[in-house]
Amino acid sequence: MKIALDPTPFHHTHKLLEFPAVAAELGFKYLQMTPHPDLIPFFNHPKADDNLVKKMKQACKDSGVEIASVLPVLRWSGPDEDAREAAIRYWKRAIQITVDLGVKTMNTEFSGRPERAEESERAFYRSMEELLPIIEREGLDVLIDPHPDDFVEDGLQAIRTIRGVNSKNIGLVYVASHTFHMNQPPLTIMREAGEMLRLVHVSDTMDHKRSHGLRYITNPPGNSVRVHQHLKIGDGDVNWPEFFGGLKEIGFLDNPNSVMCSSVFAENEKNKETAKYQLAKIQEMIG
């Protein structure tokens, strides 16, 4: 299993090409490349040219760090057809960047809309018809997270939707911080997913359903807002023994190609301290 750092907490203190050295300094051997304005920004066309990709690859080599996964967030399930078609073009470039970096894993979100779930599902499968031949040709794993405020938020429904693509190259991401939006305990989802689950994000969150749903109060009452955090392990309500125990049970921890990414976003002012804590805690909990 690869333990990776999400460098998002370092976006305000370091440049893109400095991320590999930061990861190495903190004891990580792997990076996950999440959306960044100089590489693949949220929802828009990738901004890295071939020269920048080569520089990024060299920076990793110089630091002894590998990129475990590349994470684009693009509207490939968007119910707006113009946005969906654009996302397909962006995805093709993101795939080429990933291949040129020598990376075999991409992870992402469904990126549709919950209030237009049926149209979003149609858009998702339409996009997969065009992208899947490229994904399979390049030998990539593309793993998908049922993110809060998406057309698929339920963990078991995410598995069904991915299964419908009918490709071993498409799998599941489990983000611990999304646990309380997925409607089933981690172990239930992990057991159902089995080998489909090949990437997890490790960060804690509060259970927004506790205290009669009044742990968080948003106004006006009854609005459709989703709330979660990306806290360090132990600062929220995630059942970590169940989480790590489930991963061990399904063989995730013994898979050399699976990725476990530390993704704490709530403590940028203590980014290095938090990253070191996360790595030590992960190593402790996997034994």
Feature map (PLM): residue ranges:
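Acidic/histidine-rich catalytic cores of soluble enzymes
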Residues: 2-8, 31, 37, 126-237, ...
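Short, acidic/polar
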Residues: 12-23, 85-96, 182-190
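Conserved beta-strand positions in the central sheet of alpha/beta enzyme cores
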Residues: 32, 69-71, 107, 143, ...
